[in-house]
Amino acid sequence: MAQLQEWLGKIEYELLAGDPAVAVDDVIYDSRKAAPGKVFVCIPGSRADGHDFIPDVYEKGVRAFVVEKKLSELRIPEDPSVTVLRVPDARKALAYLAAERFGNPFRKMISIGVTGTKGKTTVTTMIRTILEASGKKAGLIGTTGCFIDGKRTPTVNTTPESYELHEDFAKMVEAGCEYVIMECSSQGFKLQRTCGLMYDCGIFLNISPDHIGPAEHESFEEYLACKAMLLSQCRKAIVNDDALHTDEVIRISGIAPEKVIRYSVKHDADVSVGAIEYISTPDFTGTRFTAKGLYEGEILLPLPGYFNIENTLAALTASALLSLPAEKVAEGVLSTSVNGRMEVVARTDRFTIFVDYAHNEVSMVSLLDTLRKDYKPERLVVIFGCGGNRSKDRRTGMGKAAAEAADFTVITSDNPRFEKPEDILRDIHEAYLEAGGKEENCILIADRRAAIRYAMEHAEKGDMIAVIGKGHEDYVEINGVRTHFLDREVILEEKEALKL
């Protein structure tokens, strides 16, 4: 047991009742975990308010509370054993409490945070692979899970809640990790999940309009400001000099110019590119290029696409900052494999088929344009859908992108959630036609497995087939129920069934 006051650290608070020296053994924000010895942080959420659960957790033995509201607004029993602390921001308080409760494990590792609308998973995975090739032990937290000692545990969010973050950091330290690499989402910054963390290196990849809506960001300006928070929480910043809004992100963050390192594919920078060769053979799809500047050497990249050169430059710049040996860096890049990110799943004498997470207009256009320009397929086929109960702008944008950038389009389901799949497909199809797409170059197949099978069965020689939108996701959500579905598995199963 500890005294609550030992965990308060940087937290500004007003003591409303009781004694901050109360004995506690853990921090909770979920009322279902209530038990004697816990301090309950009352977080006001979009769906539920933690303050409303005070009577319930009190009945389960909780006697220490961190709140945002006045005592008169709370239903707290009159009990001299109860301690109540009022704070300006309960989410910030949770982050500081969690850090202290686990002994500030984040500070015991070299830390790298990566933010961007697209590319976070690829860059964090590549940096981890490079570190491991260099003989360093690294933990990773991101969209595809938390990775410690070769073991993966699922994460609910790209950037988990602050308590879970510090719990994972503690496990990493216990496992002997020297480094931690994190995907840092804008939502994570907005909800103070990374509050109090100072990264040794922060990487800004790019930003484009996305995640703007009632449950996410109110405006692009807010989204931009949240992305910029990483640069205000790092000792050194690595930025993509080719991305839109990079200078604005630097300005908003307030980071000193001498702490910023720039990389570019288009022009000379601290790290840049020389000759580029795009490779597509029966055995390898990827890129060979020469890097110059802070990192120098030839790189063979097994991930297709121009934007993956950008992603790789970010990882190379971080490697240079960490003084990792160049030959080990190149070895790490070559062995990088990212589930659901430009992942080549199968090749035949007729087609190459791969999976990608592209789930909005910007990432879809970038992917399709790159494939056409760099690999020059005879035909570019795209299979995609849009999630239900989400902004309909994505349906319009992705339908338009398919009409403009693909030769043949298969519109299918993604996660329909509580909408009818047929309604979503119709919205996408209408946008496709309005953008000039031809009816004969498009088919609607609501069953995603059947859609994948159709594209492979009807493939023509030289086809590149992109199955996009779900990437690493291993489920489909229909009417609130998730059932197992992984694009990669389905492709291989259907390929075998078709004897291709």
State what each model feature region is.
Residues 67-68, 88, 142, 184, ...:
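Short loop/edge segments at beta-strand edges and connector loops
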Residues 8, 92-237, 241, 247-256, ...:
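Phosphate-binding loop of NTP-binding sites
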Residues 67-70, 184, 206, 241, ...:
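Short secondary-structure boundary segments
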Residues 24, 36-37, 62, 81, ...:
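Short, well-ordered alpha-helix to beta-strand connector turns
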Residues 1-15, 36-39, 49, 257-259, ...:
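ATP-dependent carboxylate-amine ligase
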Residues 1-96, 300, 304-306, 493-500:
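N-terminal leader/targeting and accessory segments in enzymes
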Residues 10, 73-78, 175, 190, ...:
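Acidic, Mg2+-coordinating active-site environments of NTP-dependent enzymes
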Residues 59, 63-69, 237-241, 381-384, ...:
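Short internal beta-strands
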